[in-house]
Amino acid sequence: MLKTILLLLTLSCFPLLIACTNSEDEVFEVVTKMASIVGPGGTQDDHDYYLEHITDNFNSTWGYPTVADCAADIEECIGDSPLDPPKKQTLKVDGNTATITVAATEQSPTGDTFKLVFDLTLVKQDGVWKGDTITAGDDKIPSGVDLVPLELNEMLFSYDPTDVRIKSGKFAFHIENKGDQVHEAVLLHIKKDAPLVELMETRDPEGVGFLGVKVPVIPGADAKMAIPELESGRYALICFLPDQSAPGGEGPPHFALGMVSEFEVE
């Protein structure tokens, strides 16, 4: 009798298991395809696929409040950088919502490659899985490295530059966006004894060094940012994203509105 009950319970779970597996396969197929699509040089079929698999919300923080707005400026909306092939082990499906971690291999101003990590959320609408939000994901933080709180807001970085962990040069940031706009945290090494804005204006490669970036951090989101161990000297946090409260979301860059901050490592 007990064996019969267990068998019936097991068989009753099969449809749920199959449904879950099918949903995971469907989501992963969409994400894999979306990761490969680029704007400039992309095919019409690829662009159509992209538009069919995003919600109005997906690009709203970048000045495209609807899918139709994205379609009208498709190459710029999608961009020219494909994502790395996704890994299925990071995929989680819960009903009509799914999340997955994706990454992009980028090149720094010095020519070095680095990884950007993103958390992508998809929703199922009318039987179709669509990208709904994308925000910066967590970096792997080495054991023994402390997290220093860093809040993003309009238009400032909130943290304690006198924190002994920052002064030591061995730390990572736990970033939280407490504002209403999308922000980023770009970490720079100021190598010359001159104002940061002056060095940026001259674009002197010997004056400022790029160390990392966490982007985009959408309102209400948080992310852990790994940082290389810093030597003694001046460093800066800066946000280059445009003021999204301006018409079309293309206002002046946040740093021009005050979102720049310096700290020193001893």
Residue ranges and their predicted role:
Residues 8-16:
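Bacterial N-terminal signal peptides
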Residues 19-37:
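Short, low-complexity N-terminal intrinsically disordered segments enriched in polar/charged residues
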Residues 42-71:
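Short, well-ordered alpha-helical segments enriched in acidic and aromatic residues
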Residues 70-113, 119, 137-138:
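Surface-exposed, charged secondary-structure patches
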Residues 115-143:
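Short beta-strand edge/turn micro-motifs at domain boundaries
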Residues 118-120, 144-154, 158, 167-168, ...:
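Extracellular/periplasmic metallocenter environments
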Residues 169-173:
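Structural beta-strand segments of beta-rich domains
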Residues 175-177:
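Asparagine-centered strand-capping/turn motif at beta-strand->loop junctions
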